Amino acid sequence: MKRFPVFIATVMMVSAMQAADKLDLKAITSGEFAASYVTGINPIDGTDLYASISNDGKQVISYSFKTGKQMSILFDVNAVKAPFEQIEGYVISPDGKKLLIMTHREAIYRRSFKAEYFVYDIAKKSLKKLSQGVNQQVATWSPDSRHIAFVKDNNLFVTDGDKETQITRDGKFNEVINGIPDWVYEEEFSFNRAFAWNADGTAIGWIRFDESHVKTYSLQMFEGSHPTHSEYHDYPGEYSYKYPKAGQDNSKVSLWSYDMKNGKTVALDVPVDSDGYYPRIKTSPDANSLIVYTMNRHQDDMRLYAVNPFTGKSKMLIKESVPKFVKEEVIENSIVGKKNILLPSDRDGFMHLYLYDMNGKLLRQVEKGNYDVTSIYGMDEKTGDVYFQAAKLNAHDRQVYVAHKNGKVERLTDAAGSNSAYFSGDYRYFVNTWSSYSHPYVFTVRSNKGKLIKTLEDNKQLLEKTRKYNWGKRETFSFTTSEGVKLDGWMVKPVDFDASKKYPVILFQYSGPGNQQVLDSWSTGSMGNGGAFDYYLAQEGFIIACVDGRGTGGRGAEFEKSTYLRLGDLESKDQVETALYMGSLPYVDKDNIGIWGWSYGGFNTLMSMSEGRPVFKAGVAVAPPTCYRFYDSVYTERYMRTPKENEEGYKVNPIERVKQQHGALLICHGLADDNVHPQNTFEYAEALVQADKDFKTLWYTNRNHGISGGNTRNHLLRQIANWFKQNLK
């Protein structure tokens, strides 16, 4: 009897606190829950130092790996009276005497951008603009620090700081590109620079893209706002660019080099199929060669060649051929060192590392086991130690490891969650970035034995803020589907969760090939930032759950490649199975389960709502592909081959099974989406109309695949939240 009033008072106090600190979408989308970072980390070659950009973006500062202490200010915006207010990036010259500083960055596509570049002489404290006229792209030091190469208006240039030389002259928008990739190469092979210096800076090689025969896609543009396009004040306009779709013509690619001494251009002869790819060109330790990667159109055969930039002759070094497809990460994570090539491969069923010499001879498999290597940091060629990240403990965890020459593998990080690293040039130290479901990013300096030297940033204030707002716990779970497949997931419950009640559930998923959303990281969650949007929805009375189905990453090649040739089939079955599992839990209202996702997650939302088992009462698809005939050639054919080769596989799509669509459906799309075109939603909307299905669409003026700018993201998330509030309660 005496305890009862105390209990009531406690509940009232907690309720008052929760009411006072209620999550707000405006706060979430304005960056209030954004983490702090240590930005622009660059190890300084030949030293035990690294550099980074100051928090205010006005300085480049060097620090000691050994002590963690600040050593010197390499550049200061105010001290040199720079004609810009902030640094947006920088590259230290190989000799350490100059900085190439980037500012006024202007995004083009996902990875590409134009910027205004300046060269800063550290000793002389002099600042000079790299080039006059329009802004440049991918400015890059030569290995001897004497020249900088860059691209301007689709042409390749070099400068020594005084004299600027134009190497190519045929570059033209929507026709010819030199030294930077076309749209599909950039998006699907994950790079934005298509040139490389040779080892001593006496030659430069590049990929030339002839996209004149690639079909054009046009996006309608309006005046809009944030930013405003005044040129479309009275009449809308168009942005037209080359976009090869599945089975259609790609750019015709060729390789060229320029001799810095005699000014001659040489055609490089590297064998590739007429419809194949050159997905990378890299510097080799030998000045008489460059390393070129080739890939056939099916993307199941990748080769590395050494090509002489002066004669154009080449020889094959390595051939990588695996069932179904070579993952894009094999190209992205491979490293050409001074004496060796490190190549990741899933040839034995899991992604592991293989060491080759510069003649292409396989020396050894670096490590083994039933786990995937997820990133490579490099090799200390003095000791033979190889440093990498792997999902060795489980599919949802990332740790940093070293594999010794004798085959012994040691773990260098100890905190469960997601760990990554920036190593010093001599591999004696590294900057460790760690986070987990419940803890924002922590940046520390460590020795190559894993010993903590200094904490650079711990995001303590953000952590305290999440506690102030009563963010709940992200609980993990597993279950087995009716097909005998074990799937893993997480869920977020309301803070005042009562197991005797029944709650509506919202499933969030991406489900795309190789992707993971069930990952013990602060980046996990439907909109990043520690999953702030998930906690907002939980605050509104929902349970939020996420499950990685078949085709996702971290569990080996068999699991990841199981969706080959039939994208959306198994993925949608697994989300339906997730809904059935959630519905079996005593605290879940099985009649009020929704699903949503963005991009591939939007595609799989539509597929799941038309899978045939009507388990979803509502769903939201953001920027969804609706038929892979509409999507780009490289991505789609990697997993599906061409429509001509796989007609039945391409029929597995939301449009084909629109009559089975079940549940209240909201589709959101940006009208300027250069990645997943609005065409996808337009065509699906027409199919829904003809099938006599009710639905709602939201269009965002001038917004690309990210759907942001001004108040846009706040508006979008409010529509998603309101849709589920209206239809699941």
Listing of model-derived features with the role each one plays in the protein:
Residues 215, 287, 420-729:
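Serine-hydrolase catalytic core recognition
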Residues 38-42, 52-62, 72-74, 88-91, ...:
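Non-catalytic accessory segments flanking enzyme active sites
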Residues 111-158, 163-194:
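Asp-box/WD-like beta-propeller blade repeats and closely related beta-sheet repeat scaffolds
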Residues 36-41, 85-91, 180-200, 280-281, ...:
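Signature of short aromatic-glycine-proline-rich micro-motifs recurring in repeat-based ectodomains
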Residues 65-68, 121-125, 160-163, 259-263, ...:
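Short loop/turn segments that connect beta-strands within beta-propeller blades
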Residues 69-96, 106, 132-137, 321-324, ...:
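Blade-loop segments of beta-propeller domains
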Residues 51-57, 64, 92, 99-111, ...:
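Beta-strand C-termini and the immediately following turn/loop, strongest in propeller blades
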Residues 25, 31, 68, 104-109, ...:
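Predominantly five- to eight-bladed beta-propeller fold
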